[in-house]
């Protein structure tokens, strides 16, 4: 039975109401510092921990709760007579409920003007110590680290005579150990990323020890293949506009491949300012277009490769209205992603309950790093978020691209970044015309892109081509020109750049270099 609670929180969300409910149930309240003042100002009967222990706070508040009367009351096992006799001998009452959350270390180091001294002062000592003590003794002590659990604890107490059951106590304890592990991980990441202890850590510095923390969203039916198990985890600091913020409106449970492909589609479509549509198959764009609205963009994107679009993932950067919904509903679609769906669009898909509708608010946030597991290790790199501006482009051929060609080149370059290497993308008039992806040789990607356009009945005459990396030889360039391209955008940087540029001049086309490569594996 919960008779006494100790409350000490940095995040004071809902704490006054929670403490009042505890007091109404006859629970004695202990507290520290600012939390004690807040509760007292609210008219609640509360005892300061310093008065309770008979020992004042000291060292500018660094020592408040590190006292045997606190930790003895938390750690004593109620089922062991010798523990209870020790408490009685030393005049220590039990503490049955601990409500603690920690100094805001992560929020502190996120500030641009944070110094090492600021960070150090926001490393909580007493809080984690109490939390771990209570979580260790969860058979006898209820421990709450998350304000979202206040209601759960109160409901159980009211239903069971001020008692919280073991299943809930165990769940709350595991939550505590996860929280303190994440907290210590953040401290380790920060301190080991400092190049000089007198300076603030550079955000581009990789820590000597890397701790990662994610919360499980759900178990998945299976992994990339049916014989593989899988689960989906969400970053604790999910950036605005990230896929993990999705809200599923309808449809079957998401699979591993659904989530992976949806991320590829969403990241690509977010980069466009105009209404855009991206169709993804096996993590590669098979159709991308901008248009007057979502329906127009979809119609153009679908034209690129209707065969591959079957069973694909489709993303929009504008609301899906009735017209767009009716167009999409004619095809077999696995997942549809958009910032919003009109009521009329939802009605259209209500007749297709297997279609998964994901709603995600637009945002320009991105993961800070890309992670890739290798045998026994982890590759970590900054995100490829580089978007080349027109002013950075360098025309290296005798012929300058026209204004229309430049628009097509920039569109093609934006798409190529999201195509698996080696990537060749034909574009024109705000849409992809042919996509060659994932080939071991660039010339084969060029041939495949040309064949794709041919199969879709699309002309490549006057088209623009983007290559995610340089042309190592002129053969790839010869293929795209033979298909009808009149301008090319590529990074440059090959030992044979001069030969490739000479070939472009020989063909009378325009070539633009970005100086930026977009390998994607």
Swiss-Prot record:
GO terms for cellular component: cytosol. It catalyses: (6R)-10-formyltetrahydrofolate + 5-amino-1-(5-phospho-beta-D-ribosyl)imidazole-4-carboxamide = 5-formamido-1-(5-phospho-D-ribosyl)imidazole-4-carboxamide + (6S)-5,6,7,8-tetrahydrofolate; IMP + H2O = 5-formamido-1-(5-phospho-D-ribosyl)imidazole-4-carboxamide. SUPFAM superfamilies: Cytidine deaminase-like, Methylglyoxal synthase-like. InterPro entries: AICAR_Tfase_dup_dom_sf, Cytidine_deaminase-like, MGS-like_dom, MGS-like_dom_sf, PurH-like. Signal peptide: none annotated. Its EC number is 2.1.2.3, 3.5.4.10. The IMP cyclohydrolase activity resides in the N-terminal region. This is Bifunctional purine biosynthesis protein PurH. The lineage of its organism: Bacteria, Pseudomonadati, Pseudomonadota, Betaproteobacteria, Burkholderiales. The gene is purH.
């Amino acid at each position: 039975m919960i008779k006494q609670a100790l409350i000490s929180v940095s995040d004071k969300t809902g704490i006054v109401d929670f403490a009042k409910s505890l007091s109404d149930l006859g629970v004695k309240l202990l507290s520290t510092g600012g939390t004690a003042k807040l509760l007292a100002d609210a008219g609640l009967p509360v005892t300061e921990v310093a008065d309770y222990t008979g020992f004042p706070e000291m060292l500018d508040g660094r020592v408040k709760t590190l006292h045997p009367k606190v930790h003895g009351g938390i750690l004593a096992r109620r089922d062991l007579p010798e523990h209870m006799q020790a408490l009685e001998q030393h005049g220590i009452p039990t503490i049955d409920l601990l409500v603690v959350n920690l100094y805001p270390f992560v929020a502190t180091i996120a500030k641009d003007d944070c110094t090492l001294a600021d960070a150090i002062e926001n490393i909580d000592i007493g809080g984690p110590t109490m939390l771990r003590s209570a979580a260790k003794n969860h058979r006898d002590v209820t421990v709450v680290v998350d304000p979202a659990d206040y209601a759960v604890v109160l409901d159980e107490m009211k239903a069971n005579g001020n008692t919280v059951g073991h299943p809930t106590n165990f769940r709350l304890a595991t939550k505590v150990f996860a929280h303190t592990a994440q907290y210590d991980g953040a401290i380790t990441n920060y301190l080991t990323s400092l190049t000089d202890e007198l300076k603030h850590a550079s955000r581009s510095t990789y820590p000597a020890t890397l701790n990662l923390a994610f919360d499980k969203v759900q178990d998945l039916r299976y992994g990339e293949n049916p014989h593989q198990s899988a689960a989906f985890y969400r970053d604790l600091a999910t950036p605005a506009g990230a896929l993990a913020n999705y809200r599923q409106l309808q449809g079957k449970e998401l699979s591993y491949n659904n989530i992976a492909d949806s991320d590829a589609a969403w990241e690509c479509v977010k980069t466009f300012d105009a209404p855009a549509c991206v169709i993804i198959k096996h993590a590669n764009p098979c159709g991308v277009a901008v248009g007057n609205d979502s329906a127009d963009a979809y119609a153009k994107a679908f034209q690129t490769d209707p065969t591959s679009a079957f069973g694909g993932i489709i993303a929009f950067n504008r609301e899906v209205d009735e017209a767009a919904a009716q167009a999409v509903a004619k095809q077999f679609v696995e997942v549809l992603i958009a910032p919003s769906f009109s009521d009329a669009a939802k009605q259209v898909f209500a007749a297709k309950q297997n279609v998964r509708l994901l709603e995600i608010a637009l945002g320009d946030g991105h993961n800070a790093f890309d992670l890739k597991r290798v045998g026994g290790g982890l590759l970590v790199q900054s995100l490829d978020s580089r978007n080349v501006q027109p002013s950075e482009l360098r025309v290296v051929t005798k012929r300058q691209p026209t204004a229309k060609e430049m628009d097509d080149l920039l569109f093609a370059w934006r798409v190529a970044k999201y195509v698996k290497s080696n990537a060749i993308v034909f574009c024109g008039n705000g849409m992809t015309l042919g996509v060659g992806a994932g080939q071991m040789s660039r010339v084969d990607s060029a041939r495949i892109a040309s064949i794709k356009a041919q199969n879709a009945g699309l002309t490549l005459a006057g088209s623009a081509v983007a290559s995610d990396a340089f042309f190592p030889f002129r053969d790839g360039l010869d293929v795209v020109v033979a298909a009808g391209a009149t301008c090319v955008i590529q990074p440059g940087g090959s030992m044979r750049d001069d030969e490739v540029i000479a070939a472009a001049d020989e063909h009378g086309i325009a070539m633009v270099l970005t100086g930026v490569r977009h390998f994607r594996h």
